[in-house]
Amino acid sequence: MSIFNKHAHQERPYIVIVDIDGTISEATEDRLHLLPPPGKGALTKDWNEFNLVCDTDTPITPVIDIVRQLFNVYTVWFVTGRCEIARDKTRAWLRKYVTNGAEPLLSMR
């Protein structure tokens, strides 16, 4: 049975929480240019645009390799400050690069 199923957190006594941005994914230049310059403030619209191109992020492979090893012992729960609007793209990215197609446990802002 896959540890990525919806009851995984009930089958294992400990949970490892893994942040996404800057931990297992690196924002690309295509994404970073959407943010306003420092000191200019950021509107929700800016963050929505930024988060909606999260599927272009580059995987940080050495960290992902460690996270995959953690799956053997622990329930792994991903967290992010991304807006809810990017949930589907975030889940798709995790399935593609981290969970080998299985549905990830995910909490978003």
Locate the predicted segments by residue.
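Short, basic/aromatic recognition patches
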Residues: 1-6
